[in-house]
Amino acid sequence: MSALTVGTATVSTSLVAGTNTYPNNQGNDNDVLTTNGSGTLTWSAPAGGGGGKETIVNSSSAISGTLNLDFESAQIYHYTANAGGNWTVNFRGSSSVTLNNTMDTNQSLTFVLYSQQGSTAYYNNGWQIDGSGKTPKWLGGFGTPNSGHTNSVDVYTYTIMKIGNNDFRIYANQNFYT
């Protein structure tokens, strides 16, 4: 049977066609249709990746010690005070949710960390996911950075891939702005 075009249909309740249930309104600007996996479609705001805008954490604190980077808060962290010492980054979902429970297997995410440096430069020298130590692979083949860059803004980019349950890979890069 070929497709049948009827024209415009006005539906005052949800439309059921076959096994699919469609919403009875047009949604809001920029909404997308989502499914519950059982054939019911609803309008919702797009999740992640859409729109080309990212939320940042902009902090006037000095980085040192252990720095928790929470995916549920932001993926871009901007620290404007001079770093106060070398630091460890701990990637997690939030203070109450692990990154392991936030990500599915075969998903990736990227964090970016901007660290202001003064006349004494410090650097990221430890890495954790959900409090467990990890060793990143570093871009460029030069190994793990062993210093920061004085009077600059160091930028660290970390791409995290979840390979399996509590099985992650971190691919990292350090660069700087003067």
Kindly give the residue locations of the regions a language model identified.
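Extracellular beta-solenoid/beta-roll
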Residues: G49-H78
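Extracellular repetitive beta-rich solenoid segments
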Residues: M1-G50, F71-S73, T80-W87, F91-T110, ...
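Short, Lys/Arg-rich amphipathic alpha-helical interaction segments
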Residues: F168-I170
